[in-house]
């Protein structure tokens, strides 16, 4: 009887033990479906076609609803005991909890009404819509047109929110808005065929579409540009000139806005995934800046210059470091990238299948944006990753920065990490939606250092370029916290960047504008890179001759983008496993 009772206990205990795991996986499925529903254009790029004719809802009511729904997910998540989950699901739970908590917290700040920065905005994101969608069938083109035709409603919503933001004191500083107007006016195309929105209709006709229907689709697209999109962008331009720009903020700091200090503290936590304070980060930046300055001094003297400053003057002004056409800059960039491609197997055991391409940054945004950026592709939609290069102001785009820049943006940096994440056997929300700046950008900055192993920094100028990029990210820690927590002005920030990096004036201006208009984001780079370098040093010391750099890199990338404490735990577990091999 006792044995039978024990057997009954075991039989009934199994479902009870499984219940929390089942509840958790059900929550994961519902949460992922929610993410797709709230991100209809991204869902299309992932191959989910349920929302093909929809665009995102930017409204504050939608923000409030999403915050409530995130809070409901969070309550359900907290009711599931962590101890009942597998080690893998405990990591999923921790990452999901952080993401949901940040969604709820972000919605409490008035800064949610600030819908654009000097780097991006709803109007710029929509102008790049075609870059992220498949165009293989007639249905693809029809759904794209349906989305274009909804832009005036999105634009009106965004302008209403921005008008409220102006009334309540959430406005970008005057000092950063010099190039913002062009990001609006540059999208307006008098000839619809030359519009960015029309570009998909210049491609070969889809196989399932006859000539007459294709001609009709092209006519509909021209109509959309002329009668739908151009008027919406013109309305935005008029609003910007008459209702936004005259009310731009005099202070460069987000702390001057209502609730700004609390908002900045949130942004620091969010972007670094740490509990570091602005003051602690500022001090780290000063130490790193001093260390890198000393290295730059050594390189300058070895190159025959009397000082670091003398070498930097030469790097900024010597014509031999610059090209005169966009095509030449893209060619030099492509040469570096193909060289790196051939060296990747020596540093990584697993490489992504998705390729990447190189394109110039669109003209309407190039003059006011950064040197380069990466846009992920989509294996499901047959879209390669894209490394965008700034080909404006060519006298400010030196060749010596191309190796470090390319390592960061393409491979082994962003493309390698993100395209690999898209292939990993992770919970779908982590595979497709999770990106922590401290990891993603920390990895990109760490990837620049791998140019040493690859032999790319083979001249003093290229080595100085790498060190300047290191100094640039160290300076971000000083400048971002200086502006938003310590009362610095833009002029102080620009001077610190000039004194501590070899960046050209155009780059410095664009970068400082970015830090001012996007508080905290720039902190993740150096904080993340320092953690990855520290973990590599820990592994090298612990494993000695057993340390395998390829296996270390594969381990760092094996879980996709994660908070830094999760990364540390996974590397420590790998070190223990390697010791036992």
Model regions: which residues?
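Sec-dependent signal peptide recognition
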Residues: 1-7
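N-terminal signal peptide c-region/cleavage motif recognized by signal peptidases
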Residues: 11-15
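N-terminal maturation segment of proteins
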Residues: 18-581
């Amino acid at each position: 009887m006792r044995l039978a009772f024990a057997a009954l206990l075991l039989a009934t205990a199994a479902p009870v033990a499984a219940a929390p795991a089942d509840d958790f996986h059900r929550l994961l499925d519902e949460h992922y479906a929610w993410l797709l529903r709230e991100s209809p254009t991204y869902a299309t790029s992932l191959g989910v076609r349920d929302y093909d004719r929809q665009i995102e809802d930017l409204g504050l009511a939608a923000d409030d609803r999403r915050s409530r729904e995130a809070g409901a997910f969070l309550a359900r998540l907290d009711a599931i005991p962590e101890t009942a989950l597998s080690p893998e699901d405990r990591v999923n739970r921790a990452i999901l909890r952080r993401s949901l908590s940040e969604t709820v917290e972000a919605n409490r700040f008035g800064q949610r009404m600030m819908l654009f920065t000097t780097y991006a905005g709803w109007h710029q994101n929509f102008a790049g819509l075609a870059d992220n969608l498949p165009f293989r069938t007639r249905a693809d083109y029809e759904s794209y047109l349906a989305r274009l035709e909804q832009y005036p409603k999105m634009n009106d919503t965004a302008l209403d929110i921005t008008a409220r933001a102006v009334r309540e004191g959430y406005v970008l500083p005057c000092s950063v808005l010099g190039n913002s107007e062009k990001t609006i006016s540059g999208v307006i195309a008098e000839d619809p065929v030359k519009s960015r929105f029309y570009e998909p209709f210049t491609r070969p006709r889809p196989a399932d579409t006859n000539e007459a229907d294709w001609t009709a689709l092209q006519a509909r697209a021209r109509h959309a540009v002329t009668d739908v999109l151009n008027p919406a962008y013109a309305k935005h331009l008029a609003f910007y000139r008459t209702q936004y720009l005259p009310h731009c903020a005099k202070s460069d700091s987000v702390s001057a806005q209502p609730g700004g200090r609390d908002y900045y503290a949130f942004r620091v936590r969010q972007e670094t995934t740490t509990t570091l304070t602005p003051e602690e980060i500022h001090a780290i930046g000063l130490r790193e800046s001093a260390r890198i300055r000393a290295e730059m001094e050594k390189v300058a003297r070895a190159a025959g210059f009397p000082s670091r400053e003398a070498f930097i003057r030469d790097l900024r002004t010597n014509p031999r470091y610059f090209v005169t056409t966009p095509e030449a800059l893209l060619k030099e960039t492509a040469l570096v990238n193909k060289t790196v491609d051939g060296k990747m197997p020596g540093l990584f055991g697993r490489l992504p299948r998705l390729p990447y391409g190189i394109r110039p940054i669109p003209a309407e945004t190039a003059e006011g944006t950064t040197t380069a950026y990466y846009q992920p592709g989509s294996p499901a939609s047959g879209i390669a990753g894209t490394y965008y290069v700034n080909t404006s102001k060519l006298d400010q785009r030196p060749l010596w920065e191309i190796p470090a820049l390319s390592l960061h943006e393409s491979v082994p940096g962003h493309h390698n990490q993100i395209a690999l994440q898209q292939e990993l056997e992770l919970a779908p929300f982590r595979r497709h939606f999770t990106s922590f700046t401290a990891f993603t950008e920390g990895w990109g900055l760490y990837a620049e250092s791998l140019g040493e192993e690859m032999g790319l920094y083979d001249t003093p100028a290229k080595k100085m370029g790498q060190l300047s990029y290191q100094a640039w990210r160290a300076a971000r820690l000083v400048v971002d916290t200086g502006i938003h927590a310590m009362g610095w002005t833009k002029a102080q920030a620009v001077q610190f960047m000039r004194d501590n990096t070899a960046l050209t004036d155009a780059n410095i201006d664009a970068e400082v504008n970015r830090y001012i208009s996007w508080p905290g984001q720039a902190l993740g780079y150096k904080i993340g890179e320092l953690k990855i370098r520290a973990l590599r040093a820990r592994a090298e010391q612990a494993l000695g001759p057993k340390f395998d750099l390829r296996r270390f890199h594969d381990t760092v990338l094996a879980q996709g983008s994660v908070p830094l404490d999760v990364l540390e735990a996974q590397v420590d577990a790998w070190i223990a496993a390697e010791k036992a091999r």
